[in-house]
């Protein structure tokens, strides 16, 4: 991608707070017009990146580049980058209209221009009827919309959102996710969003940056992150995962290997390179696994085991299976399986203790080295 297609870049950026390393040698390119999410647990460095982009922090080393220009020492008010904070930071004594127009007023814009742009911003977030209200008379979701309107009214190059849904209830969070994504498409500007919620990141983003302990673990589309995790950390962080321990026993061709997994021979597919005898970890999402009744065994290789638990979740059923152990006296591996619920399918009504055969959809496995990479 050409350099001019990036609105923001971090090049070799590290950030220290006293002796604590918050970010370590970060390289990140943010594309014009994309919805990018920084995803990770508390303390991983995602908010520090946001503060570097906004200008509230400066890097200890490396460069922050905005539209091709190094902006390490450029203050926030000169970057044309706006931030929506967790607490919304609305002025309680001002009306909604005055809150949204505050930045334009500070820029000494003409009154008629302020009125027009505030009106357009409020219409964009469906609050045109609430201009005369004070923040205290608004719901949490409405306050958030005001904060967003105030941020976009200045026509920023980039809008930064720091876990803005954290104070909202579940249904309102879901609604706001759709509204924010629609708004981003409508405006056509770059949104950089911070969250620890994987579902939130996947629902809204063009690309996701998975972070851990001040480092970037993987960058990719939601589908790439979920289906092709770069390592065990990413696989575990973005959803439920089953991990089978195994050994490569032979190579059939460029992508197909024979392996022994939990004591059972299986073929596995991977683009990674392995040698005979290499220890591996095979990763399977719960929805990739298939269960078979013992009176209807599948062709090819399969595990055997027993149902331990079933959990009804409405659209799906979670099924816990204990595999038969390859070693006498040792418990077998426990697997989590997810199946779509069908009340007319008698075979999905498993009972604890029931024997089953276990397979998966060929090619959907992820094979990593024994070190989890």
Curated annotation (Swiss-Prot):
Broad class of enzyme this protein falls into: translocase
InterPro entries given in the database record: AAA+_ATPase, ABC_SmlMolc_Importer, ABC_transporter-like_ATP-bd, ABC_transporter-like_CS, Mo/tungstate-bd_C_term_dom, P-loop_NTPase, PotA-like, PotA_ATP-bd
Domain ABC transporter, first and last residues per copy: 8-238
Database matches in Pfam families: ABC_tran (PF00005), TOBE_2 (PF08402)
Function comment: Part of the ABC transporter complex PotABCD involved in spermidine/putrescine import. Responsible for energy coupling to the transport system.
GO cellular component annotations of the record: ATP-binding cassette (ABC) transporter complex
rRNA-binding found in the keyword field: no
Lipid bilayer topology: Peripheral membrane protein
Gene Ontology terms, MF aspect: ABC-type putrescine transporter activity; ATP binding; ATP hydrolysis activity
Source domain of life: Bacteria
Binding site for ATP: 40-47
Catalytic activities: ATP + H2O + polyamine-[polyamine-binding protein]Side 1 = ADP + phosphate + polyamineSide 2 + [polyamine-binding protein]Side 1
Keywords: ATP-binding, Cell inner membrane, Cell membrane, Membrane, Nucleotide-binding, Translocase, Transport
Organism: Oleidesulfovibrio alaskensis (strain ATCC BAA-1058 / DSM 17464 / G20)
Location in or out of the cell: Cell inner membrane
UniProt main location, coarse: membrane
Protein name: Spermidine/putrescine import ATP-binding protein PotA
Family: Belongs to the ABC transporter superfamily. Spermidine/putrescine importer (TC 3.A.1.11.1) family.
EC numbers: 7.6.2.11
Signal peptide: none
Binding partners and assembly: The complex is composed of two ATP-binding proteins (PotA), two transmembrane proteins (PotB and PotC) and a solute-binding protein (PotD).
């Amino acid at each position: 991608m050409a350099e001019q297609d990036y609105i923001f870049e971090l090049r070799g950026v590290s950030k220290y707070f006293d002796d604590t390393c918050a970010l370590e040698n970060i390289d990140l390119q943010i594309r014009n017009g994309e919805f990018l999410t920084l995803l990770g647990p508390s303390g991983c460095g995602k908010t520090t990146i946001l503060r570097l982009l906004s200008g509230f922090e400066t890097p200890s080393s490396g460069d922050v580049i905005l539209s091709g220009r190094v902006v390490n020492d450029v203050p926030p008010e000169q970057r044309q980058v706006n931030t929506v904070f967790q607490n919304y930071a609305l002025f309680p004594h001002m009306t909604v209209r005055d809150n949204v127009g505050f930045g334009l007023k500070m820029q000494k814009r003409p009154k008629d221009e302020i009125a027009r742009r505030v009106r357009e911003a409020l219409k964009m977030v469906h609050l045109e009827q609430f201009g005369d209200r004070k923040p205290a008379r608004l719901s949490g979701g409405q306050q958030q919309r005001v904060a967003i309107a105030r941020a976009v009214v200045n026509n920023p190059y980039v809008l930064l959102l720091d876990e803005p849904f954290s104070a909202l209830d579940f249904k309102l969070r879901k609604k706001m996710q759709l509204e924010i994504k629609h708004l981003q498409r409508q405006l056509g500007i770059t949104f950089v969003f911070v969250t620890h919620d994987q579902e939130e990141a996947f629902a809204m983003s063009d690309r996701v940056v998975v972070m851990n302990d001040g480092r970037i673990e993987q960058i990719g589309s939601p589908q790439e992150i979920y289906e092709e995790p770069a390592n065990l950390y990413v696989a575990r962080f973005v959803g439920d995962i089953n991990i089978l321990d195994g050994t490569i026993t032979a190579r059939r061709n460029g992508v197909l290997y024979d392996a022994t997994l939990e004591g059972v021979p299986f073929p596995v597919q991977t683009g990674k390179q392995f040698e005979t005898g290499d220890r591996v970890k095979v990763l399977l999402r719960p929805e990739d696994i298939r269960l078979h009744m013992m009176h209807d065994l599948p062709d090819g290789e399969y595990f055997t085991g027993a149902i331990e638990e079933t959990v009804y979740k409405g659209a799906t059923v979670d099924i816990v299976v204990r595999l038969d152990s390859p070693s006498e006296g040792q418990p077998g591996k426990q697997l989590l399986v997810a199946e779509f619920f069908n009340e007319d399918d008698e075979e999905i009504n498993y009972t604890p203790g029931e024997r089953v055969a276990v397979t998966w959809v060929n090619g959907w496995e992820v094979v990593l080295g024994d070190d989890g990479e």
